[in-house]
Amino acid sequence: MIERRSIINGDCLEVKKEMEDNSVDLICTDPPYKMTSRGCHGNTGGMLAKKIAMKGQVFNHNDCNVKDWMPEVFRVLKNGCHCYIMCNQINLIEYLNIATQCGFHFIKSLIWDKQSKIMGRAYMSQYEYILFFRKGAFKQVNNCGVSDI
């Protein structure tokens, strides 16, 4: 049993198994993006090419399927509470579709301006999306005068 009023910093794939239904007030997560190197889906070469080719991934849970963890996120979140999920343009549509299939209400997307550019093969990105979802009935958000960027 997880102690009440606690902030949990751990592997959600493991920790969520110990959580009761409707027991979490807020979920804020930044799942691993399906990348192998340099912000791309496939191996693009460079310094990490050999190391990544041997391991096949950069992140420990690179192969984690959103269909496996999103229903659990919905299960543990209390009704009326919010879920924020960081993602990039590659995962955006998949996260939106699966979250709404699980029962989440999509509120809006926020922009995380990182103030620095991330290297890639095309245009350099300096932002990521934060998807804002709600489970169940509306709950007031404090300080709505804050910009969404």
Show which residues each predicted segment covers.
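Core catalytic lobe of class I
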Residues: 1-149
